Amino acid sequence: MQINEKHLLIGNVRWVRSPNHGGYLENKEPDTIVIHYTAGSSAESSVRSLCSEKSKASAHLVIGRDGSIFQLVPFNMIAWHAGQSSHEETGRRGLNKFSIGIELDNAGLLTKQSENSYLSWFGKSYPANEVLAATHRNQQTEKFWHLYTEEQLTACLEVCRILSAHYPIKFVLGHEEISPGRKVDPGPAFPLEKLREKVLDTDRSDDDETDFTMFKSEHTLKVNIDRLNIRTGPGVSHSLARTNPLTEGDSVKVLRKDGKWIQVEVDGLVGWVNGKYLR
């Protein structure tokens, strides 16, 4: 993919023009990328909403769960994605004037219905292997979040690198960082710090793409330590998924990876363990 003289992404990208935009960005080019989730049921429904004049909202890009990409607004024009927003480091207010908005198709915050059913605000249920239990950076209690797919995270990273090569991108931010208390996207299921590092750090000699995408591997490993706690999220700060730990020799089905932590399924329970204790 590449960006043409009309500030459109060329390649396997669908152009769907949104009427919801302002004039040119400050300096007529962006220096910031803002990541969002759609909180919608599909990429297509979110594109329709962002292209409806009634919504008074838009974004430059929407990335589907299969990695498909839609562009709605040229990159040199103001899209209406950030709303009331500010950036402490630069002192800016109204980030729409400086940024490219990228929406990823994701249901967002979910409500637990049972051990294997989590409900979105629009009524769709998701299984436990598509859910992360985690505490948001701006909150105090653990909640349930829809996971992103490997395909859309890979597409997001590729697009952000293309944007960074074409424009003087200095900042990669989450909506939750520029509108804290008002917005929670892209949420703890999105590897925001890793994206920032991989887009803004020009030294890629030791790059590991799977470290960003948290790929699904779906194979079986065994516990190689006497006792191994299984937690509700990737880290010791998360609560135990069950009180009795796994024991040496127990088999677990690997679902996905987040750094050194691995999401596993065992006896119908989905949780997270430290990967160094699996073989």
Task: Indicate residue ranges for each PLM-predicted region.
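SH3-family beta-barrel domains
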Residues: D207-T232, T243-T247, L255-D258, Y277-R279
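Active-site-adjacent loop/helix surface patches within enzyme catalytic domains
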Residues: Q2-H166, K170
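Short, low-complexity, polybasic intrinsically disordered segments
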Residues: G181-F212
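Acidic/histidine-rich, metal-coordinating catalytic segments
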Residues: H166-R182
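SH3/SH3-like beta-barrel fold
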Residues: G249, I262-V266
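Boundary regions of SH3-family modules and the immediately adjacent low-complexity/disordered segments
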Residues: V266-R279
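Short alpha-helix capping/helix-loop boundary micro-motifs
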Residues: G235-A241
